[in-house]
C-alpha cells in the first residue's frame, strides 16, 4: 500500500503558531491470535519515519504555551539530532509472560494520565474494559497550576481535592485511549467514546 504525506505537511505558506498542534495522532492497538501484540503509530515504508505531529512536541517558542497550555522551555527547543519531550506511552501489561492489557492514547500531555488511569481502573479496581476506558479522568500538568477533572468526577471528590489546596477546573476530554483486555481466554477491545472515530 502506498503512503503519501498529509497535504498540509508540505506547503509554501507560513502557518500560524500551533497549526500542527491541531492535527490528530493515528494510533493502532492490536492483539493477534498467536499472541503477538502491538501498540503503534504509522511508519512510512522503508524509512523508519513515524508519520505524526511529534515535531510539535518541541518548544516552538520558549516561554509560550502551546495548544495544551504547556509552557515551552529552552531545553526542549528544536535542534538537529534532538528528540522532543513526549507524552506518548503505549503500554503492554504482562502477567505470567502473556499480555493481559494493551493501552495507548492520544491527547498531548494528557496521554500519560489517560493511559495510567485506564490501567489502574483495570488492574487495581478490576473494572471491565469498557468501564475502565469510559471512566471520568483527572489530569495535572504542573503549568498551568490547576487540576483538570472531567464532568463525571463526583462533587465530594472535587471538594476533597480543593480542601487539599488544588485549584480544580472542569474540562471535557482529558485524553483518548484504545485498549485491549485479555481475560479468561477471551479478548475484549474498547475505543474511547471521547473520540468520534471508533475502533475496537
Q: What are these regions, as identified by a protein language model?
A:
Residues 1-4:
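Amphipathic alpha-helical
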Residues 10-12, 182:
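Alpha-helical and His/Cys-centered functional microenvironments
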Residues 12, 16-174:
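Proteins synthesized as precursors that undergo proteolytic processing into mature forms
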Residues 156-200:
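In a subset of proteins, long, contiguous C-terminal domains/tails are tracked
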Amino acid at each position: 500500500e502506498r503512503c503519501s504525506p498529509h497535504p498540509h505537511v508540505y506547503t509554501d505558506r507560513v502557518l500560524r503558531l500551533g497549526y500542527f498542534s491541531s492535527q490528530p495522532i493515528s494510533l493502532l492497538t492490536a492483539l493477534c491470535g498467536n499472541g503477538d501484540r502491538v501498540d503503534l503509530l504509522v511508519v512510512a515504508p522503508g524509512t523508519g519515519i513515524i508519520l505524526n505531529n511529534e515535531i510539535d512536541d518541541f518548544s516552538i517558542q520558549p516561554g509560550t504555551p502551546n495548544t495544551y497550555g504547556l509552557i515551552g522551555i529552552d531545553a526542549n527547543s528544536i535542534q538537529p539530532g534532538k528528540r522532543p519531550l513526549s507524552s506518548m506511552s503505549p503500554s503492554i501489561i504482562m502477567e505470567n509472560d502473556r499480555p493481559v492489557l494493551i493501552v495507548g492514547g492520544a491527547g498531548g500531555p494528557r496521554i500519560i494520565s489517560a493511559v495510567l488511569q485506564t490501567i489502574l481502573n483495570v488492574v487495581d479496581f478490576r473494572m471491565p474494559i469498557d468501564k475502565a476506558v469510559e471512566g471520568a479522568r483527572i489530569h495535572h500538568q504542573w503549568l498551568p497550576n490547576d487540576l483538570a477533572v472531567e464532568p463525571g468526577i463526583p462533587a465530594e471528590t472535587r471538594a476533597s481535592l480543593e480542601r487539599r489546596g488544588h485549584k480544580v477546573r472542569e474540562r471535557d476530554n482529558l485524553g483518548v485511549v484504545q485498549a485491549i483486555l485479555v481475560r479468561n481466554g477471551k479478548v475484549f477491545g474498547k475505543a474511547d467514546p471521547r473520540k468520534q472515530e471508533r475502533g475496537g
